[in-house]
Amino acid sequence: MNDQPWMDSEWMQKMRTKRADAAVTIRTRKFLTNRLLQRKQMVVDVIHPGLANVSKDELRSKIGKMYKADKEVVSVFGFKTHFGGGKTTGFALIYDNVEALKNFEPKHRLVRIGLAEAPKGGRKQRKEKKNREKKFRGVRKSKKPRKE
């Protein structure tokens, strides 16, 4: 139960639904077709007055719909919200196909959109494994160090 009764009022409920239905405008500028990397690239301005930031997943689907492309080939990144809120600017890339996306996008962005798997284990574990394997120079490397 809330300590503030006005939070559960009818007016507050109406405001919540009004904010959820508020329009989000997406504008693109600096549009460029990059044939070498098999993509279209652009700067995206998202205008969302009175709302929190729009999720990247939602932006991917809306930009895909704007350019008649599948959501899977759209990559969005680098979004910064302007002071005071209401406007966010970032970048979008629309690839010709999923293979081009997998070839040219950085691995961390592929992990974020679910097209690649994050590396297992931490940085320290990888370094320790590398150094263990270096100890046996000149002999066949195995997972377990040899007992002498």
Curated annotation (Swiss-Prot):
Record's compositionally biased regions (Basic residues): 121-148
GO cellular component: ribonucleoprotein complex; ribosome
GO molecular function term, any single one: structural constituent of ribosome
SUPFAM superfamilies: Ribosomal proteins S24e, L23 and L15e
GO biological processes: translation
Alphabetical list of InterPro entries matching this protein: eRP_eS24_sf (IPR053709), Ribosomal_eS24 (IPR001976), Ribosomal_eS24_CS (IPR018098), Ribosomal_uL23/eL15/eS24_sf (IPR012678)
Region Disordered: start-end pairs: 115-148
HAMAP family reported in the protein's UniProt record: Ribosomal_eS24 (MF_00545)
Protein name (record): Small ribosomal subunit protein eS24
Organism, scientific name: Mucor circinelloides f. lusitanicus (Mucor racemosus var. lusitanicus)
